[in-house]
Amino acid sequence: MEDTKQRILEKSLELFSTKGYDAVSVGEIAKAVGIKAPSLYNHFPSKQAIFDAILETTSAHYQKDTAEISVHVQDSQKDIPVFSHISEELLVEKVRQIFLYSLHDKTISQFRRMMTLEQFRSPKFAELLSKRYVDWMISYDAGIFRALVANGELRNEDPDTLAWMYVSPIIVLLSVCDRQPEREAESLAKLDAHVKLFFRTFNIVGGEK
């Protein structure tokens, strides 16, 4: 039964990411899974319940995977020791890791595409997309920068503004790769250049700049 439930979640997300949430029926999901529509209700009472389960499992999946590379999006305090006195090369490597993971992990990529498709049709999806791919990232990096400014490792600038400057190009490059996968190499080069410039502009080495 658990295998069937997992297949329902996987096939639903696949369909939602290509056609949009509203355009997919329960019958279509059941057909993709290889079961009859009434059987699907033995596992989930509604399409909304399927979406809620996808949201929960995707969030857990993301938090587990990113924690392995010391990125705790909802608790930046855990990662301050990782980013304190980090080298330019290591910072570039870590940003590349999270960027490539977000781009190529099947579950995360499909979930982002689903939200992107639905953002203009549903205020709920628009809010969720902003929360996951803007608000959380800004809050996370602002928390890191706030600690580094206090420690004298970053220039004494507003941490929230620094976070917006840092995160915005990354979000743009991710969206470019979603729309045009053939531009991945170009986007990675731009990502590296952005992180290096930010590091050299705001990092303090041997005193205030």
What do the predicted segments below correspond to?
Residues 7, 11, 15-57:
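Helix-turn-helix
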Residues 11, 15, 57, 97, ...:
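Amphipathic alpha-helical interface segments
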Residues 45-49, 53, 103, 120, ...:
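Residues in soluble alpha-helical coiled-coils and helical-bundle/repeat scaffolds
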Residues 56-62, 69-70:
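Short, basic, alpha-helical segments at the C-terminal edge of helix-turn-helix-like DNA-binding modules
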Residues 67-106, 163-166:
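Hydrophobic alpha-helical connector segments
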Residues 95-99, 112-116, 166, 170, ...:
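Short alpha-helical scaffolding segments that buttress acidic/His motifs in well-ordered protein cores
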Residues 103-116, 120-150:
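Amphipathic alpha-helical packing segments from all-alpha helical-bundle domains
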Residues 127, 131, 135, 145-197, ...:
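Hydrophobic/aromatic-rich alpha-helical bundle segments in the mid-to-C-terminal region
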